[in-house]
Structure formats: C-alpha cells, structure tokens
Regions:
Chain A
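A domain-level signal for the structural core that forms small-molecule/cofactor-binding pockets
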Residues: 1-142
Length: 142, 142, 142
C-alpha cells in the first residue's frame, strides 16, 4: 500500500543508506500493517532533470507517498505520522544539509490488488494473518 | 487517460514483452475509449533502488494506474476490470514467478488536456469521432 | 507543491530547453505562491519503455501535475490555467511537432511538509513571508 517514490540527487544516498531507509520506513508502517505492503522506489535525478523553484536541484529530496491501506482518521493523526516520518528521514537528509519536501496522497482501497487478491480490510482476521505470515493469501472472510 | 507506470526488475520483460503488454493493455481500454488515450510507461529498477517490505525487490512488479476518462460506476465494475487486468498480466508476471501489486487512482476529468483540446465526455459524438479516427480534434459539441 | 513529471523522448529537449521550461513553469505558479514550491522532474523515456495507444512513443510528451498548495476554485479557473500552461509549452512541444497530454491531480493540503514545516494556508502572512524570502521558515501564525 504505501508506495513511496524518493527523488534524489544521484550522490545523496549510498546503497547502504537506501537499504537502511527502506527498512526504517517499513518499520513505521509495519507497526500496524503487513510489512510487504510497503514499497519504496528511489529515483536518482541529475540536476539537469530536476528543478525546484526554477533552479537545478542538487541538494533537494522530494518524496511522494501514495497511501492505500489506511486513511488518516484525523488531522492530528496525520501530524503525528508525518512528524515521525520527518524524524526517521532526518539523519539521511536534514542532518546532511539537504532540503526536502514530502506529500501524501490517498487512493481508493477498493481499487487495489496484490498477487490477484483484494487485500482484507484493516484489523480483520485476514489482515492479521497476512501480517503474521508476511505474504498475501486467499481471504477466509468476506 | 489511463496512464500506467510499471516498475519492474530490469530483466523481467524483453522489448517484445513490453510491446505485447502495451498492446494488450490498450486493447482492454480500447473496447470503450480511444486507443490513443492509453499511456504505458515501463520503469526498470535495480534492486538497490526498489524495496518491498524493506527488502531489495528483484522479483516484484508494481503497477500504478491513473484513470481520468472513466470512473468505476460500482465496486462490481471495478472488480471485473481488475480481474481482467490480472488475467492479461498473468503470462508475463504470475506465470513467470513474479509477485505483483497494482492500484488505481482516479483523477479529475476536467483537469485533462490532449494536444490543447479538452477531451469530450464519454460516449458523446465527439468521443466517438476521436475513437474512430484515433486522434484528437476540435470538439463540435459543447 | 506543484510537482510536475514530464515524460519525454530522450532527444526532445536540450538541457537549455529544460532549464527554460522549468523557469517558465515556475513563473506561472510564482505569480501566486512561493517559487520554491515548484518542482519539475524530467523523465527521458526510450520508445521501448513508453507506449501511447499501444505503439512506441517517440514523438509524445506526457505531463503529470500534482497540485497541493491550491485547488481550482471553478472549472473556468482550471480552463484559464491549463490554457496558459499549454501556451507556455507550445514552443517546446506543439511547435516542434510533438503530441502531448497533461492532467492535474489535487492532493490533500494537510498531508504536505517542507523541511519539516507544514506550509501556511494560501495568502496568509506566513505564506507571504515564505514567498518574499523564497524559503520555508517557522510559522508565526496558527
């Protein structure tokens, strides 16, 4: 469900950084949903292909987060979540002197499929099994 | 309208596979709308730039489908459509042992333009002409 | 806020073209919001990775515009804006014989963060300061 796209200057993150970041982002979501829901795409961009404010961006990280499995129940919940994400990102971005921007879009739960299955609703027995087994399987409840 | 982005391991699809997949995806939509509405982008991703569940993804295909020209009229219609898409994808993905995930987002019809034209509403005379000619042209109806 | 992704054939735009386009796009948004809100990503795509209507696309430019900071207040406002964008693009796309398609999606204002800040509402004193200084800073109003 969450699909992250991280646009970044080619030299911003090492392969180790990327693996760590993906793991830590997955930990945040994994506290409430199956870990295999979390996709993270890194898109290195040369400054000639990436502009912020009309200027080539060689110190900027832009993150797009598509949420499907969960909707924020309130503004406060979204603030807590985004603050936590900013804290996870800090050692890799802010602390290295990069600027960054992120936004979340929410897309329809019903128009989503994994390995041909339609994912179970949050906190159902089926989702609990998907989470425990960390893989999709046929639903046993409607 | 539909814009598909297919994130995949670099070796997952040959050029022939990609051309076939694009053709078959276009056939599905082309049954009800102009074929030239259908855009398909393949994005090969090295495992160090693509993580699922916090692990490098070398056997995973992630598909994002942006729908503009049509909204699903019902849950049942969306199920039929997504099941059909999963069947079209199977020989290229499931049958080769890849895991895959897809989701659809719907974006506003009115904020869409092709070659400077605003596309006609579904099933109007203008859309029928666009479809028959497989190209955009000035609208003759409001 | 606006994040543009411009999918284009590798040879469609020179580096000078890209810098000019990013500047002109930023000028349009900069008339009403901070210039640093504007992100533009160029994604060159080989024809074997980019299909329109089921055919490899070597003369097609596809633009995705994600809007966060402002929502269109009316259909008329969206038409004026998109017409203006099409006019800005024309010398680089239509006048060179390329086909093109664009669409706008609007995503939630509240789920957006820049350098750890939550951007101020349109036309507030805080936004005016962000615009005048062309950088984010701590909000002084709720």
């Amino acid at each position: 469900m969450p699909l992250w796209t991280i646009y970044h200057p080619p030299g911003a993150f090492s392969d180790v950084d990327k693996a760590e970041l993906a793991e830590k982002i997955t930990d945040v979501y994994g506290a409430v949903m199956p870990r295999f829901y979390v996709g993270v795409v890194f898109q290195p961009l040369e400054p000639r292909n990436f502009y912020v404010g009309g200027k080539p961006a060689d110190r900027f990280v832009r993150i797009v987060m598509e949420h499907i499995a969960r909707s924020f129940p309130s503004l406060e919940a979204s603030r807590r979540f985004i603050d936590r994400i900013n804290a996870v990102l800090a050692p890799y971005i802010a602390d290295r002197g990069y600027d960054w921007e992120l936004h979340v879009d929410e897309t329809p739960f019903d128009y989503w499929s994994i390995n041909g299955h339609y994912p179970p609703r949050p906190d159902t027995d089926d989702e609990k099994r998907w989470r425990a087994e960390n893989r999709p399987s046929a639903r046993t409840h409607a």
